[in-house]
Amino acid sequence: MKKNFFEFSDKILSASDAAMKKAALKFAEIDEITEYNQQKVLAAFIHNRVSEADFAGSTGYGYGDRGREKLDSIYAEAFGAEDAIVRHSFTCGTHTLCVALFGLLRPGDTMLCVTGKPYDTIHSVIGLSGNGMGSLKDFGVKYEQVELNLNGLPDLTAIEKALEKKPRMVYIQRSRGYSLRPSLSVAQISEIAALVKSKCDAIVMVDNCYGEFVERTEPTEAGADIIAGSLIKNAGGAIARTGGYIAGKKELVELCAYRATTPGLGKEVGCTLGENRNMFMGVFNAPGVVGSALKCAVFAAAMFEDFGFKVTPSSSESRHDIIQALCLETPERLVEFCKGIQSGAPVDSYVVPEPWDMPGYDSKVIMAAGAFILGSSIELSADAPLREPYAVWMQGGINFASAKTAVMLAAEMLSKEGLI
């Protein structure tokens, strides 16, 4: 006998059934991409002859850590890059991006962001906020940006004009951040990279957070020179406990490695302290976990479309990251939605989220995140700045069944309050 563990109302059960039927074709497409990416990662493991001995951790300087070296090689192969540096010592995505930016840019260089203003958390790295903290601006690196066009897409004409100033770096943020603009496809990134290469010798860097394994190819296979991301997002597969990666052209990765450690030492040092096994398991499981997260996003889009809300991307649109934005129109709905997501978490389900002043953001933020790894956004989470357009951005889901249940609980919470 089928048991209704969470006492869902008939309204929400019917909405769930309708959303599942609506999402069926997109789910099949996600399964195909997941299988392709899983085979790609498996091939990288086999080519690199991974063994039990590679999981042993090193201490001290970390000289000769074979596991660390093979993990770098697996990431490079999976991402179609010449080289990679994957380290648990990268504390978050912002830190990893910061290492890459400081590794590649020098005083007098110009960083040109061609996808509008980047994530709030990177502003203080660039020098858009804060003074005297050691930002790129403090070290004489100039910053310019090209706004997106009215459709939220890269403005190629404006980018071409900006390239006349010969920037040292063209920076692309693949994901949407706290905006409703579309995430960028690898094909769109390729188009930007081709334009850049035709006009100057700038480094094309991509913030790849939330985008790994969503498509069959990565930006480094489509013209990007360097990419960076977090291991507590897609690439860590909900198993890596911390860390980040940088992948791309060998000489550029080397420069980033010199920044991550010291000039002259680079990738040759850095003990792994027993984290190798988790990091290997994480990237191996990443394609499947990303597939589950994508299904959760499509399911949520389908359900909330049927409730009459604007969602982006829609349940039928192509996906280029794992993020789903739901425009819930009022702060009350944001709060109740996040309470519902939190109530469906395996960890801290009893906690009631409240808006708070989160470091790095310019408005109060409410977050739902009951994760095994603190701050993980490949595990189901939702965040919403309490500002117009009162949208919530949700992402992640270790497995689809549990993530789907949490979305249903969020809908139930809204329904009980008379908000849908």
Each predicted region: which residue ranges?
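Flexible linker/loop signature enriched in Pro/Ser/Thr and Pro/Gly
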Residues: 58, 78-81
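Conserved C-terminal alpha-helix-loop-beta "cap" of PLP-dependent enzymes
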Residues: 305-420
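Structural motif
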Residues: 83-86, 109-112, 168-169, 202-204, ...
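Conserved PLP-enzyme active-site core in the AAT-like
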Residues: 2-24, 31-32, 40-47, 51-54, ...
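Short glycine-rich or small-residue beta-strand-to-loop segments that form or flank ligand, phosphate
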Residues: 58-59, 85-88, 322-327
